[in-house]
Amino acid sequence: METVAYIGLGLCVLGVCLISWGLWDLARIIKSLHDTK
């Protein structure tokens, strides 16, 4: 049971990292689009 909890926790952390990285990338793209105009 403990291994399942650790795997679930690891996936949650990974998901949060991917979401925050994706949002950071999106913000950077939007900023570059505003700069070119």
From Swiss-Prot:
InterPro entries: DUF5516. It comes from the Viruses. Pfam families: DUF5516. This is Protein 6.3. It comes from Escherichia phage T7.
